[in-house]
Design a protein with these regions (language model features):
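Structure-specific nucleic-acid interaction/processing domains
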Residues: 1-32, 36-127
Length: 131
């Protein structure tokens, strides 16, 4: 196989998708997320944390103190890709279910609460009136 064929085969190979968490082993705080590529997500988060560029400032702070040894990267639920189905919507639904418990916000975790639809619409409207 040449390089071009290998690249095409890689892109066409279905990736495992699902919900994951990054758990602080010291204080049990968690970051919960979902992804279409479970294989790559942990590498992405490790890279961001090692480069001190993770979007969660609290997680970054704790990572800087404890390092990789202080955290566990765990798959909470895996979802099989299905044709004729909005896989991203399924993932978002699953993530929302996992966010209900343990509600990893504030003292319990590193996630930021999702805004309600009304809050998002209000923000969009406010930006339009400012511009």
């Amino acid at each position: 196989m040449n390089r071009k064929e290998l690249k095409r085969e890689y892109k066409e190979t279905p990736r495992p998708m699902g919900v994951f968490q990054i758990r602080n082993l010291k204080n049990e705080k968690v970051f919960v997320g979902s992804t279409m590529n479970l294989d790559g997500i942990f590498n992405r988060h490790r890279f961001q944390l090692n480069a001190e560029s993770h979007p969660s400032n609290e997680l970054q702070k704790d990572w800087n103190e404890s390092g990789v040894e202080g955290f566990a990267f765990e798959i909470l639920e895996e979802l099989n890709q299905r044709e004729n189905l909005d896989n991203q919507a399924e993932l978002t639904f699953l993530e929302d279910l996992w966010l209900e418990n343990p509600q990893p916000y504030g003292e319990k975790g590193y996630n930021v609460p999702k805004k309600t639809r009304e809050e998002r619409l209000r923000m969009i409207a406010a930006k339009r009136f400012v511009n």
